[in-house]
Amino acid sequence: MIPGNRMLMVVLLCQVLLGGATDASLIPETGKKKVAEIQGHAGGRRSGQSHELLRDFEATLLQMFGLRRRPQPSKSAVIPDYMRDLYRLQSGEEEEEEQSQGTGLEYPERPASRANTVRSFHHEEHLENIPGTSESSAFRFFFNLSSIPENEVISSAELRLFREQVDQGPDWEQGFHRINIYEVMKPPAEMVPGHLITRLLDTRLVRHNVTRWETFDVSPAVLRWTREKQPNYGLAIEVTHLHQTRTHQGQHVRISRSLPQGSGNWAQLRPLLVTFGHDGRGHTLTRRRAKRSPKHHPQRSRKKNKNCRRHSLYVDFSDVGWNDWIVAPPGYQAFYCHGDCPFPLADHLNSTNHAIVQTLVNSVNSSIPKACCVPTELSAISMLYLDEYDKVVLKNYQEMVVEGCGCR
């Protein structure tokens, strides 16, 4: 479980140490004067100490995020559209945007129900042709999954392949082809030349006249590679056409870039392996309903309520220089709890019996402190980011948003 209060404290401290960012939304207005005073008194000692503390704070945050070091994404890193769509569905944004986006993506309820982490992997662009029959073509390709952490238990995996419609021949509208996905069980050096030792993972009969993504279950292979630590010799794809010559086979199932195709377009059409796993911390992914962003109104001149309640605190990842590897969200409303817990405690202050007793004793004995205004309900956020290996990760982090406050 990710400690949300610790996360907020560390982000605030990082913000203090970043010098020129004191006007950012991470620090409430009431705290900015104190920050300025701290900066003024620190003098020459501040520079060396702040850099050292900042490294410690950043290391703590990265550990909370399950990262060993700060990601330094390359300019060539690509965020698959599928992962962006999953994030929008997971965070509740897609329901508001689906009419304009028109993605038609179906949320993977079953795989997500056992996972709090989704990872995506592009295949290595070295393909090995496999001898086939006159009616089929086959290729072997490889996904490097070595960046999956040891403590993450994979529950399922899927292979996504993009295929384009075939418009050749008089019967193309009624035509079908079959796509078979295999796990390669033996390396080439141990095989009889020209033959693969494989096992079938998934198969599908599809129409020629449809352009779309196809999803195949490759969980048995990925579980062997990750849980059982068996060697990863890659996957094989076989495309069989019932009424086409071999020269037309496989051209519409996109597993390699065509010469006239731009790198940007190909980056979004490459085969994609997606894993669903759980690191043992927090709850699984659950699709959220869309939430309307709260509207901020200017403070009225009337006397403010000083009792315990929730206050706005927006965490902007650009304020701590993390917007280069955190894809979404750019920030989030974390909130914080602040205010008095006066005697007698009102019902709306969401107090415990112990807090009521403590407040009662405080009313006659001031040496006993009042009950404290603290979060009573916390919720998770979803984050889409690039890890230290340039792999795209969608992850749930628990206890990041204050939903309710009370006197405890």
Curated annotation (Swiss-Prot):
Glycosylation sites: N144, N209, N350, N365
Matches recorded under SMART domains: TGFB
GO cellular component, as recorded: extracellular region; extracellular space; vesicle
InterPro entries hit by this protein: BMP4_TGF_beta-like (IPR047833), Cystine-knot_cytokine (IPR029034), TGF-b_C (IPR001839), TGF-b_propeptide (IPR001111), TGF-beta-rel (IPR015615), TGFb_CS (IPR017948)
Basic residues bias: start-end ranges: 284-307
Domain of life: Eukaryota
Sites bearing Phosphoserine, chain numbering: S91
Keyword annotations of the record: Chondrogenesis, Cleavage on pair of basic residues, Cytokine, Developmental protein, Differentiation, Disulfide bond, Extracellular matrix, Glycoprotein, Growth factor, Osteogenesis, Phosphoprotein, Secreted, Signal
Positions of the propeptide segment: 20-292
UniProt signal peptide: 1-19
One protein family per Pfam: TGF_beta
GO biological process, one term: anatomical structure formation involved in morphogenesis
Region (Disordered): 91-113, 281-307
Positions of disulphide bridges: C308-C373, C337-C405, C341-C407
CDD domains (alphabetical): TGF_beta_BMP4_BMP2B
Sample GO molecular function, one term: co-receptor binding
Keyword Phosphoprotein: yes
Name used for this protein in its record: Bone morphogenetic protein 4
Protein species of origin: Rattus norvegicus
Encoding gene per record: Bmp4
